Amino acid sequence: MKQSILGAWGGILLSLSLLSAHVTAQTIRITYPESRAVFQRNLDQTSIIYVSGNYFQPIDSVQARLVFENPGQGLSTNWQTVQRNPQGGVFQGPVRGTTGWYRLEVRAFTGRNIIGEDVIRKVGIGEVFIITGQSNAQGFQDLGAAGAADDRVNCVDYDNFANSSLADPPAPKFQQLSAGALIGPRGQSAWCWGILGDLIAKQYNCPVLFINTAWAGTTIRNWVESSRGQVAKNIFAIGTPNENFPTGMPYGNLIIALRYYCSLFGLRAVLWQQGETDNVPLNLQRKEYADAMQFLVNQTRADTDRYPAWILARSSYNQGKVSPSIIQAQSDVIGTYNNNVLPGPFTDPIQIPRPGDNVHFGGDGLRQLAQAWYNTMDAIFFTSSLPLLPLPQPAITTTCAANGSAVTVRLPDGYSSYSWRSGEKTQALTISTPGVYRATLKDLKGNTFLSPAVEITNPIRPATPTITLARQPGTPATGDQQVCSDSVLTLTGNAPSDIRLIWNTGAITRTLSVGAAGAYTVQASNLFGCRSVQSAPVNLVVRPRLIIPIISQAGTYSLKATVPAESGFGDFFDWRRGSNALQNQNTSI
């Protein structure tokens, strides 16, 4: 066996490369919430933003913070841990903050190293309102609606005016409340609400979100009938094909908003502006209106198992006539003890006579209406109305399916229904096609929850890795590799950042030092836990430790190298003079 006079062999460096792998430039991405989402604050001015997203390479933890968009518009937070040791490519968790308008920033860690960041601009903690009632709440185009000047005043960007769908709205989108904005799902302009939003944002230094479910021409009876599942009739279209309101309407939009947007973002109050049609032409009496109004308030609470606050405008003016009975009925509901119903503006004296049909506000009347609403939202209102806070986002788990070529995404127990965007109605979904998957969950009352989004990329089963020698990159290693017993063999994994390397020793690492004889293989494992097949093995043969030769003088001008006979070595030697190798491998020189 050949020996070196200068010492034993050093370690041999091998490298591992993958045949192919998915590579993504972005390490982490926020998928919820969307820009301009506003989360309802509590009485102590705080709230929780439930954040979720995807990551695309192994990470140890995710942190988030809120940074004010503009000086004076909030209190920036310190970094908060959203989740430790996230699994399956999805992270989720709460971020706590105070009233303000923020950038939501997240960062991903491996160990102490930041390996990825993302940001969502314009996310708020403030006030959320659902508008409902009839035309003076719904609004119109071309009557002088003024948009909000403050960038922090927002509305839901969803139009259900024509379709009158009873299905859940699409994933929430928002827009700044400009003059012509359609305040989803049914508002027809900024109406007075843009100005009201400006007033609230300025006075309380907070963002505002409006959702509008009002329906022109509706009576209090229409709202009660549709809440009971009965067909509501449009009194202005009797005998025409449009006599019946669409199925479930007008109540459908209101209860969907309470179950959907309120669950996700919370709610300060329902703003009710209605009563004109119950005056003219119906001439409804005090008790009937009061009973119906209280029934409607109670029904929204029974249908959600929550206790939303209401603010009732006192409104009855229609074509020059007012109704003390309607006004008193509205006041009766407001005055009911422990009802969480508060007084809104008395609108009958505003802009008399009114333009056009002498019922709808317009021009400066909309400014007056907004001011009247604002005047009722004083400090007492904000401390006495009981807000509903956003509900936690359901947890989600992702694992590799048994066949190794699909991913199983599982939603938590405790919900009454599960519905995937791809159409399935199951609690767990096995996915073999790349895409973004999200589910809608409902509790027994129909309150809606959105799961975190899961992004599945190809290949679901990673490619099989190969092992190559460092001195021969790109060439798969073949045959046995040898080291001496006092040395180690170091295997280095060269793989894309979204892949983990799992050795047959159980080690999960990119470099592996081994000194025991045997066969070594490696598997590629992705974020979902799906593994490739085992690589071709590298067989390690371990030779006994080389004995340091003893050099002695054999003659006047010769040297001799010897090792103990029992060592089994001594056939060949490498001789050197200084750093120069000599062309002699004999025992003497």
Locations of the language-model features?
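Short intrinsically disordered, low-complexity coil segments enriched in acidic
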Residues: 1-2, 49, 199, 506, ...
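Bacterial Sec-dependent N-terminal signal peptides
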Residues: 1-27
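N-terminal hydrophobic or amphipathic segments with adjacent small-residue motifs
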Residues: 4-5, 19, 127, 269, ...
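Acidic, contiguous N-terminal accessory segments
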Residues: 15, 42-44, 470, 482
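Cell-envelope and extracellular/periplasmic
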Residues: 26-391
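Proline- and Ser/Thr-rich low-complexity, intrinsically disordered segments
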Residues: 375, 379-589
